[in-house]
Amino acid sequence: MALRCPIVSVLGHVDHGKTSLLDKIRRTRVTQREAGGITQHIGASEIPINTIKKVSKDLLGLFKADLSIPGILVIDTPGHEAFTSLRKRGGALADIAILVVDINEGFKPQTIEAINILKQCKTPFIVAANKVDRIPGWNSSEGPFILNFNEKNQHPNAMTEFEIRLYENIIKHLNELGFDADLFSRVKDTTKTINVVPVSAMTGEGVPDLLVIISGLAQKFLEQKLALNVEGYAKGTVLELKEEKGLGKTIDAIIYDGIAKTGDFLVVGNPDGVIVSKIKALLKPKELDEMRDPKDKFKPSKQISAATGVKISAPDLDSVIAGSPLRIVPKNQVDAAKEEVLQEVEEFTILTDDEGIIIKADTMGSLEALANELRKVNAKIKKAEVGDISKKDVIEASSYASSNPLNGLIISFNTKVLADAKAEIEKSDVKLLEGKIIYKLVEEYEEWTKEMEELMKSDEINRLTKPAMIKILPNCIFRQKEPAVCGVEVLYGTLKIGSPIMSEDGKKLGYVKEMRDSQQENIKEAKVGMQVPVSIDGNIVLGRNAKENDILYVEVPEPEARKLHHEFKDELRGDEKEALSRYMELKQKIENNIFWGM
């Protein structure tokens, strides 16, 4: 029975070394070119069986492994939790997975999230315990770990430290999550126990062990799943849309099932539905090369079979979006393929809110991942689209901000900002957050939201009438009316220019027109304990409806008193709270309503 390459998914926490580990296998350097050192798009690499046998020759006899698979196809799935949706897609495509964990740091939130994804997809996995070279005293060298793990090559203290970190940082956590796990050389039953393979992406130690274990497990337990479908049409997922010299727009894709031929029809999803286009060329990357960053030209193929990474040349691909499902079929199966693809596209629809922000991304998967991560921090999303930031986006965001300043935001993941959009942003109140790492964008969103909420709260408090109690000082009446001028002491709260003043029996007396400090300079407010001359314009006549030693109050409208009492009480000083409390008690008595302001 002919077998296809098993599809291997690589998952793990950010910076635990997923792509670096693959680099060691491929002898390439993709990680250094990625934003923030974090892999941001699913990549695909074919590792042929001859390469696996070559680097693992010392182990094949030891493990009695007779490998008959043609090789492995690795999906380099992004490691940060922000890419949950892409990892789910990667996990779903994968036959088996490698979970990369730093043996020195142990499990992180993204590690646990990755395990949950693998559980959901029912994908078997092994653990690559990376960075073994950083264990104090460890003598790490390229080659099999199992041949280096002995007292001849390692100091006893280093071996003890290795055992401690292996158990405390990896095996114990797997046990807590319901998995039996052990060092791969000690595993008796691979159907019940997770294999933990120590590796070093820096030195290459353990890479042969990893390749033998992953290949052997895939072949042993997934043989039926790996049976090559020589009759069926090809099914796949779009990785990227790329411009290639001499070819125009092309699609990079992973084919995970079936056969495709030059001259077949490509059926692929886009934002408006489905595109059908006749294939001009199927191009394969040279073995051991990374699809999104090849160092050499692709080679043409008349026919390809799963599982493989492929570049597809065909007309009318401009509107294809990364992450879209695709089928490659003969002409008589186009209609059936269209129905299948449409169903998959509909699953990617992002639900939007009645109000909220705008998010844009470069791919369907990135957009979905960004939306999912923003939802986790309770973001409201009004519009979610793939594509560059346009002037229209900015105008829309500005209109959203008119009802709520928190909606005046555009978040852009890995997209361009068009020139007219930049000009529009400069003259608008719209905030733009740009980035190539989703979790950082989410962090920036949270920071911006917090700052905006504090600013909005501060603005709202400043617009509210602040409570205050004042006392007319004896021998300090300078003018009786129009306006009345006298000296007052602020007993509680904050007296501001424009504050409406009332007497203890609830009569309106006027509003504060002017205040001066001890230097006779005009001031806008006076706080508790201050004695200041004030002018009050209105019905007040000093000596008649207001006298020396009288207690006067700033009249706070009931809706504002209620807001201060319920929403902003923690923002008030102690004396302001006292002023508000006394004022509310007075109003409840005057209005004969114990619920006034409550």
Curated annotation (Swiss-Prot):
Region (G5): 200-202
Region span, G3: 76-79
Function: Function in general translation initiation by promoting the binding of the formylmethionine-tRNA to ribosomes. Seems to function along with eIF-2.
UniProt source species: Methanococcus maripaludis (strain C5 / ATCC BAA-1333)
InterPro entries reported in the protein's UniProt record: EFTU-type, P-loop_NTPase, Small_GTP-bd, T_Tr_GTP-bd_dom, TF_aIF-2_arc, TIF_IF2, TIF_IF2_dom3, TIF_IF2_dom3_sf
Residues the entry annotates as binding GTP: 12-19, 76-80, 130-133
Stretches for region G4: 130-133
Residue spans crossing the bilayer: none
SS bonds (residue pairs): none
Sequence segments annotated as region (G1): 12-19
Family per record: Belongs to the TRAFAC class translation factor GTPase superfamily. Classic translation factor GTPase family. IF-2 subfamily.
Source species, domain of life: Archaea
Gene behind this protein: infB
GO cellular component: cytoplasm
Protein name: Probable translation initiation factor IF-2
Gene Ontology terms, MF aspect: GTP binding; GTPase activity; translation initiation factor activity
